[in-house]
Amino acid sequence: MLIKSIGMYLIGILILFIALYPRHSFAFEPNIDFNAPDWVEERESADNDIPELPRAGSLFGSGDKPLFSDRRAMKPDDLITIVISENANANFTTNKNYNGASGGNVTPPSIEYTGNNEEQKQIVSELNDQAAYNLTKANNTSNFQGGGAQTRSEALNATITARIVKVLDNNTYFIHGRREVLVDGEKQILELSGVVRSFDISKDNVVQSKHIANAKIAYTSLGPISDTNHKKPVSDGIESLYPF
């Protein structure tokens, strides 16, 4: 009865510890920082204050809808469309073999007396008898063989509209975009940030994700369906603390 009470007490303490302990302490939770990289923060912003010259008698000014030029994102808070097409394939194989063997004998040296003194001969003979031992090392053989293989294939295809956060002095833009879609209580979140060149923006104001430097893309889902793909905190904690 006492052992049962102690066991229940320890189980209760373990459950309480797991419930109160932060979940991220047991398992690694992937996270992405979408803030601008340090080199973007350190770089000077470009001067976008371009004065508009008066055009006396002209029917077409340099407004937001120019007649003979493409309307592309050029300044902070302009919007730009990002076409995300990311494919990742990985194949990894490893094999390791190890064979080792050891053993041997050690024989001590003997003393030889070439004189005629019988007493000395007797002493040398006794010394040789006392040292007449062979040191033998036990034979040892070890073998190890291991290997592993991993194959992964992932794809993400989506479209998102991002905002220019900062225009750098080298004609590149730091962008950030976020989109949330709620369907039947399941929230899907797509977030992106990175640096694009003005030359990579098409005439339709579109950039492919492969042209984004320091690209950070996250696609997550929150809701009852996605919760079934994650372990519960108690199960996760017990597995993390299990020593075997």
Curated annotation (Swiss-Prot):
Q: Which GO terms describe its biological process?
A: bacterial-type flagellum-dependent cell motility
Q: Which InterPro entries match?
A: Flag_Lring (IPR000527)
A single GO cellular-component term on record: cell outer membrane
Q: Which gene name does the record give? A: flgH
For this UniProt record, the keywords arranged alphabetically read as follows: Bacterial flagellum, Cell outer membrane, Membrane, Signal
Q: Which organism is it from?
A: Helicobacter hepaticus (strain ATCC 51449 / 3B1)
The protein's job, in short, is: Assembles around the rod to form the L-ring and probably protects the motor/basal body from shearing forces during rotation.
Which family does the record claim for this protein?
A: Belongs to the FlgH family.
Pfam name, any one: FlgH
Record bears the keyword Membrane = yes
Q: What is its main location?
A: membrane
How far does the signal peptide extend, from start to end residue? Answer: 1-27
Q: Where, subcellularly, is it found?
A: Cell outer membrane; Bacterial flagellum basal body
* Assembly and oligomerization: The basal body constitutes a major portion of the flagellar organelle and consists of four rings (L,P,S, and M) mounted on a central rod.
Keyword Ribosomal protein belongs to the record: no
* Name of protein: Flagellar L-ring protein
Picking any one GO molecular function of the record gives: cytoskeletal motor activity
